[in-house]
């Protein structure tokens, strides 16, 4: 596996938290915190891809790299594919890691762990999950579950992703974490496919890959990182970052 490239897609179009990537956390925009966590993972170069010049400016102000993409992409994966073609037309990077732009407190080690399943050449896409520990999350549709077959104590081969409570019976349920590491050829194939029936029904983009016969494996990590989607989440992220700076 050659030098991975980390891409962080970001947009200002969030409805519950307007201008989310530029929200201030401990004196810096949230997107800058995510960029720093990605740099700290040590995986490889990090680029923010966005349709908003203000986001590029915020990242470049701290020495980072941002690239402007078209505003009309139907999905984040399409934005990644365009950014990849702009940044690396020669194809030097054969692994692309997609880190969501609303994870300012994510542990860099978790980002690094995302690529581990790609050491297995049978795996097309790698992702992350964590065991669900809160009973209410087992039935919450916004908590996406990975239904998977164990490959090792810390890795599942994903057979399905669902908003339902699954699998049935005794045993753990796994909360999917939407961070992906793609083989470049898998990303290119993925965006060339049209939306699939199960993807449209569950509203889960990753089902497109499974329906097309691609293999997705998930590394099991200890915790689900805090995603910032609401003003309450933003307050929590500010408190976490402030506590880290005091320690």
Swiss-Prot record:
The keyword Nucleotidyltransferase applies. Keywords: Cytoplasm, Lipopolysaccharide biosynthesis, Nucleotidyltransferase, Transferase. It comes from the Bacteria. InterPro entries: Cytidylyl_trans, KdsB, Nucleotide-diphossugar_trans. CDD domains: CMP-KDO-Synthetase. SUPFAM superfamilies: Nucleotide-diphospho-sugar transferases. Activates KDO (a required 8-carbon sugar) for incorporation into bacterial lipopolysaccharide in Gram-negative bacteria. Pathway: Nucleotide-sugar biosynthesis; CMP-3-deoxy-D-manno-octulosonate biosynthesis; CMP-3-deoxy-D-manno-octulosonate from 3-deoxy-D-manno-octulosonate and CTP: step 1/1; Bacterial outer membrane biogenesis; lipopolysaccharide biosynthesis. It catalyses: 3-deoxy-alpha-D-manno-oct-2-ulosonate + CTP = CMP-3-deoxy-beta-D-manno-octulosonate + diphosphate. GO terms for biological process: CMP-keto-3-deoxy-D-manno-octulosonic acid biosynthetic process; lipopolysaccharide biosynthetic process. PANTHER family: 3-DEOXY-MANNO-OCTULOSONATE CYTIDYLYLTRANSFERASE, 3-DEOXY-MANNO-OCTULOSONATE CYTIDYLYLTRANSFERASE, MITOCHONDRIAL. It is found in: Cytoplasm. This is 3-deoxy-manno-octulosonate cytidylyltransferase. NCBIfam families: kdsB, PRK05450.1-1, PRK05450.1-5. Belongs to the KdsB family. It comes from Methylobacterium sp. (strain 4-46). Its EC number is 2.7.7.38. GO terms for cellular component: cytosol. One of its GO terms (molecular function) is 3-deoxy-manno-octulosonate cytidylyltransferase activity. The keyword Nucleotidyltransferase applies.
């Amino acid at each position: 596996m050659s030098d991975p490239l980390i891409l962080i897609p970001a947009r200002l179009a969030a409805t519950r938290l307007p201008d989310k990537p530029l929200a201030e956390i401990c004196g810096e925009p949230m997107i800058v915190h995510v960029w720093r966590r990605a740099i700290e993972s040590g995986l490889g170069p990090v680029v923010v891809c966005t349709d908003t010049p203000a986001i590029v400016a915020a990242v470049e102000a701290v020495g980072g790299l941002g690239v402007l993409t078209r505003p009309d992409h139907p999905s984040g994966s399409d934005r990644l594919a365009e950014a990849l073609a702009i940044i690396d037309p020669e194809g030097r990077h054969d692994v692309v890691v997609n880190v969501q732009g609303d994870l300012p407190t994510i542990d860099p080690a978790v980002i690094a762990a995302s690529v581990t399943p790609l050491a297995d050449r049978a795996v097309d896409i790698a992702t992350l999950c964590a065991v669900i520990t809160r009973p209410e999350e087992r039935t919450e549709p916004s908590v996406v579950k990975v239904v998977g077959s164990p490959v090792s104590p810390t890795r599942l081969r994903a057979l399905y992703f669902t908003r339902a409570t699954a699998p049935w019976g005794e045993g753990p349920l796994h909360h999917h974490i939407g961070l992906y590491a793609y083989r470049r050829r898998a990303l290119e194939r993925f965006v060339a496919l049209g939306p699939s029936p199960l993807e449209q029904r569950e509203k889960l983009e990753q089902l497109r890959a499974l329906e097309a016969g691609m293999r997705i494996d998930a590394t099991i990590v200890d915790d689900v990182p805090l995603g910032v989607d609401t003003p309450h989440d933003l307050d929590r992220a500010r408190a976490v970052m402030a506590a880290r700076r005091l320690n």
